[in-house]
């Protein structure tokens, strides 16, 4: 079963946040502890980083009770298709990261809610789950062997 998260716009930071639904994480467990987490320079991430969470490759802010700065959850199959007839999701998000105009936050929010989450819950695509930084987040990744890449496949 895929982790259940809700999609919320944080107007103060102008980012799209994915927050866990309920009090505990439902992600797949991985063997071994995460170990000590790097201390971010920003005070926006409290000490309750929640190292017990089980998804690999998340930035430190993902473990904050305030939620991650901005994350994109997708599947390998979705990476190969289009958001709509005109835009490919990785390119759209990469443009957004560079500060170029692309898809609006409202459109992204609708895409997450209507496409990705529905597929995970109905089709059980948890095994192909990938995690990417959406952009604007300066927090370091945890347990990630290589820098985040928008075009990485599962």
Curated annotation (Swiss-Prot):
GO terms for biological process: DNA-templated transcription; symbiont-mediated activation of host NF-kappaB cascade; symbiont-mediated arrest of host cell cycle during G2/M transition; viral genome replication. It holds the Pfam family X. One of its GO terms (cellular component) is host cell nucleus. Keywords: Activation of host NF-kappa-B by virus, Activator, Apoptosis, Host cytoplasm, Host G2/M cell cycle arrest by virus, Host mitochondrion, Host nucleus, Host-virus interaction, Modulation of host cell cycle by virus, Transcription, Transcription regulation. Residues 68-117 are annotated as: Mitochondrial targeting sequence. The keyword Transport does not apply. It is found in: Host cytoplasm; Host nucleus; Host mitochondrion. A fraction may be phosphorylated in insect cells and HepG2 cells, a human hepatoblastoma cell line. Phosphorylated in vitro by host protein kinase C or mitogen-activated protein kinase. N-acetylated in insect cells. It comes from the Viruses. The keyword Transcription regulation applies. InterPro entries: Transactivation_prot_X. Belongs to the orthohepadnavirus protein X family. Multifunctional protein that plays a role in silencing host antiviral defenses and promoting viral transcription. Does not seem to be essential for HBV infection. May be directly involved in development of cirrhosis and liver cancer (hepatocellular carcinoma). Most of cytosolic activities involve modulation of cytosolic calcium. The effect on apoptosis is controversial depending on the cell types in which the studies have been conducted. May induce apoptosis by localizing in mitochondria and causing loss of mitochondrial membrane potential. HAMAP family: HBV_X. May form homodimer. May interact with host CEBPA, CFLAR, CREB1, DDB1, E4F1, HBXIP, HSPD1/HSP60, NFKBIA, POLR2E and SMAD4. Interacts with host SMC5-SMC6 complex and induces its degradation. Interacts with host TRPC4AP; leading to prevent ubiquitination of TRPC4AP. Interacts with host PLSCR1; this interaction promotes ubiquitination and degradation of HBx and impairs HBx-mediated cell proliferation. This is Protein X. It comes from Hepatitis B virus genotype C subtype adr (isolate Japan/Nishioka/1983). The gene is X.
């Amino acid at each position: 079963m895929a982790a259940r998260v809700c999609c919320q716009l944080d107007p103060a930071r102008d980012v799209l946040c994915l927050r866990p639904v309920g009090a505990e994480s439902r992600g797949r467990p991985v063997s071994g502890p995460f170990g000590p987490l790097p201390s971010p320079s920003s005070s926006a991430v409290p000490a309750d980083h929640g190292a017990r969470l089980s998804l690999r490759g998340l930035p430190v802010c993902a473990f904050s009770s305030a939620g991650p700065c901005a994350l994109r959850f997708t599947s390998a199959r979705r990476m190969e298709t289009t958001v709509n007839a005109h835009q490919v999701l990785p390119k759209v998000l990469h443009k957004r990261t560079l500060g170029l105009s692309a898809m609006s936050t409202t459109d992204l929010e609708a895409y997450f809610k209507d496409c990705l989450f529905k597929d995970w819950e109905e089709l059980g695509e948890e095994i192909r789950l990938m995690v990417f930084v959406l952009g604007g987040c300066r927090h370091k990744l945890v347990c990630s062997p290589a820098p985040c890449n928008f075009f990485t496949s599962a």
